[in-house]
A protein has these predicted regions:
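C-terminal motif of bacterial Sec signal peptides marking the signal peptidase cleavage site
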Residues: 13-16
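N-terminal targeting leaders
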Residues: 2, 8, 18-190
Length: 190
């Protein structure tokens, strides 16, 4: 009995530590973000809620590969789905989540990307993020404020940025070898 109580106590303590670590990481990320901590929290909640609702549709989840990125209430959908009906179903689910201000549906109608393609996309995302570190001529620019996602060689850029920052980020992303095109999903600050 004593061992069971100790195990439960240890589990409770460890789960509390995990929450502190995760919460601390979110707080550090929010310190560099132009969004308020509350907005960062809301965006994460929108993503979790949308994924939960999408995962309830087994037909949809087994035949589609959907990635959702939410930034400042703007929901970006990328990935693949087999037909327009599924593309519309995904959009409807996400658009109905409380807090979504705008939906950008970039799902492509085709077979799911291969593991090789997904690996190339992840590599491109990393290369673009690393390339943004070279921006040092724009005052107070912080590359962590730019969300970079890639699907089938197309790079999607999100964030609250100035127009100068956006132009420079897009220019750098376009120069990364392997990038097919760049899509701006930015919101602008003055």
């Amino acid at each position: 009995m004593r061992n069971i109580i100790l195990a439960l106590l240890l589990a409770a303590l460890l789960s509390g530590c995990a929450a502190v670590v995760v919460g601390g990481a979110t707080a550090v990320g929010a310190a560099h973000d132009r969004r308020s901590f509350g907005t960062v929290f809301d965006d994460n909640n929108i993503e979790l809620t949308a994924y939960d609702q999408l995962n309830r549709d087994r037909e949809l989840t087994t035949q589609s590969r959907v990635n959702l990125i939410v930034h400042n209430g703007v929901a970006l959908l990328i990935g693949e789905t087999p037909n327009d009906v599924f593309k519309t179903r995904v959009a409807k689910v996400v658009n109905n989540v409380k807090g979504v201000r705008r939906l950008v549906n970039e799902l492509s109608i085709e077979e799911a990307a291969s593991i090789g393609q997904r690996t190339r996309d992840a590599t491109l995302t990393t290369q673009v993020k690393a390339s943004l570190l070279q921006i040092n001529d724009i005052r107070d620019f912080d590359p962590t404020r730019v969300n970079v996602s890639t699907a089938r060689g197309v790079v999607y850029l999100m964030g609250l940025v100035t127009r100068d920052e956006a132009d420079r980020v897009v220019d750098i992303a376009r120069r990364v070898r392997g990038v097919q095109s760049v899509v701006r999903v930015f919101e602008y600050v003055s």
